[in-house]
UniProtKB/Swiss-Prot annotation:
It catalyses: Endonucleolytic cleavage of RNA, removing extra 3' nucleotides from tRNA precursor, generating 3' termini of tRNAs. A 3'-hydroxy group is left at the tRNA terminus and a 5'-phosphoryl group is left at the trailer molecule. This is Ribonuclease Z. Zn(2+) 1 binds at H60, H62, H146, D216. Its EC number is 3.1.26.11. Zn(2+) 2 binds at D64, H65, D216, H276. Homodimer. The active site is at D64. SUPFAM superfamilies: Metallo-hydrolase/oxidoreductase. Zinc phosphodiesterase, which displays some tRNA 3'-processing endonuclease activity. Probably involved in tRNA maturation, by removing a 3'-trailer from precursor tRNA. It comes from the Archaea. HAMAP family: RNase_Z_BN (MF_01818). Its cofactor is Zn(2+).
Length: 315
């Protein structure tokens, strides 16, 4: 699994920070979180394959998070895409995509499936997989608070139990149809009448990785608790402002770096990657002061301020 930060800026891009977008590479697919203007060009400078993007997750409908969608949709059409593309987002996402496709002329002839998440439900599974290789995922949404309807996402790796071949052989089960049934989750009955369940011949799976993505939001304690419940490892949280601009953060319904650190503590995650940095900052020195203080009390926690093209590998 690998995260690639395609854009780490906020409402206004800079020479060094493009509009928000994060790509997650998992099991041969790319999952894109937000798609700000210039995303498709940022992709060119990375190993992210646009044709492997099957799912785009939009946190909210502000321009800096969505204006890269039309160009990306057209470009992958030019490259011959035929398989469906899923786009997820808050209410009115369907209308937004519909209006985007009305502008000008395009040659998009692959299916686009649009899924809207509720901002009333405390949490919901909006996407999942069930691959036979045992490496699956679930994507949850959780409503957050911004100036427009907004949702956060949690990507959860789901690993299936592995077959214990030696244990199966001890029970007299040979490689063949019976073993396949057990692998597929069904019980079998041996010739002696004994029933063998999948649990009898499997090794419990290792816990998969779990990544939280806040989108734009004020700090929400419930979001931190939601992440902790699911065992979040890596938290990607907006930190538009440094701590000296708390009033600006409140007025614009954004977070400061201190807010992000507070949610990190509540989430139990071991890594924070702060992003969505305001264009007013030429460097991150004012952020680092608060990070240093936090690290003095929590030396085991990893804290990064994302830059465009940052790659983070989850091993």
């Amino acid at each position: 699994m690998k995260l690639t930060f395609l854009g780490t800026g906020a409402a206004v891009p800079t020479k060094y920070r493009s509009h928000p977008s994060v790509a997650l590479k998992f099991d041969g697919e790319i999952f894109l979180f937000d798609c700000g203007e210039n995303t498709q060009r940022q992709i060119i400078f990375t190993d992210v394959s646009p044709m492997k993007i099957n799912n785009i997750f939009i946190s909210h409908l502000h321009g800096d998070h969505i204006l890269g969608i039309p160009g990306l949709l057209q470009s992958i059409a030019f490259q011959g895409r035929k398989k469906p593309l899923n786009i997820y987002g808050p209410p009115e996402t369907k209308e937004m995509i519909k209006n985007m496709l009305k502008i000008g002329y395009h040659s998009i002839d692959y299916p686009i499936n649009i899924h809207e998440a509720s901002i009333e439900s405390p949490e919901m599974i909006i996407a999942s997989s069930n691959n036979s290789n045992g490496n699956n995922y679930e994507v949850y949404t959780f409503p957050v608070k911004h100036s427009v309807p907004s949702i956060s996402y949690l990507f959860k790796q789901i690993k299936k139990p592995q077959m214990d071949i030696k244990k199966a052989e001890t029970l007299g089960i040979e490689i063949g149809p019976d073993l396949k049934k057990l692998k597929d989750g069904f019980s079998i009955q041996l010739k002696n009448g004994k029933v063998i369940t999948p649990k009898d011949v499997t090794i419990p799976p290792k816990k998969g990785y779990c990544i939280g993505y806040s989108g734009d939001t004020i700090p929400i304690d419930e979001f931190g608790k939601f992440l902790k419940y699911h065992g979040c490892n890596v938290l990607i949280h907006e930190a538009t402002f440094d701590s000296s601009m708390q009033k600006n953060a409140v007025d614009t319904m954004h977070s400061t770096i201190l807010d992000a650190l507070d949610i990190l503590e509540k989430s139990g995650a071991r890594t924070l990657i702060a992003t969505h940095i305001s264009a007013r900052y030429d460097d991150i020195m004012s952020f680092e002061r608060d990070i240093v203080k936090f690290k003095e009390k929590n030396p085991e926690i990893e804290i990064l301020i994302a830059e465009d093209f940052l790659e983070y590998v989850l091993k």
